[in-house]
Amino acid sequence: RGSNLTIHPLRNTNDIDY
């Protein structure tokens, strides 16, 4: 995870590392 941390949490297009 943590592929794209720049992606907004609203758009889950990429793996967001929470």
Swiss-Prot record:
One of its GO terms (cellular component) is extracellular region. Highly expressed in the placenta between day 60 and day 100 of gestation. GO terms for molecular function: aspartic-type endopeptidase activity. Glycans are attached at residue 4. Its EC number is 3.4.23.-. GO terms for biological process: proteolysis. Keywords: Aspartyl protease, Glycoprotein, Hydrolase, Protease, Secreted. The keyword Ribonucleoprotein does not apply. The keyword Secreted applies. It is found in: Secreted, Extracellular space. Belongs to the peptidase A1 family. On the 2D-gel the determined pI of this protein is: 4.0, its MW determined on 1D-gel is: 61 kDa. This is Pregnancy-associated glycoprotein 61b.
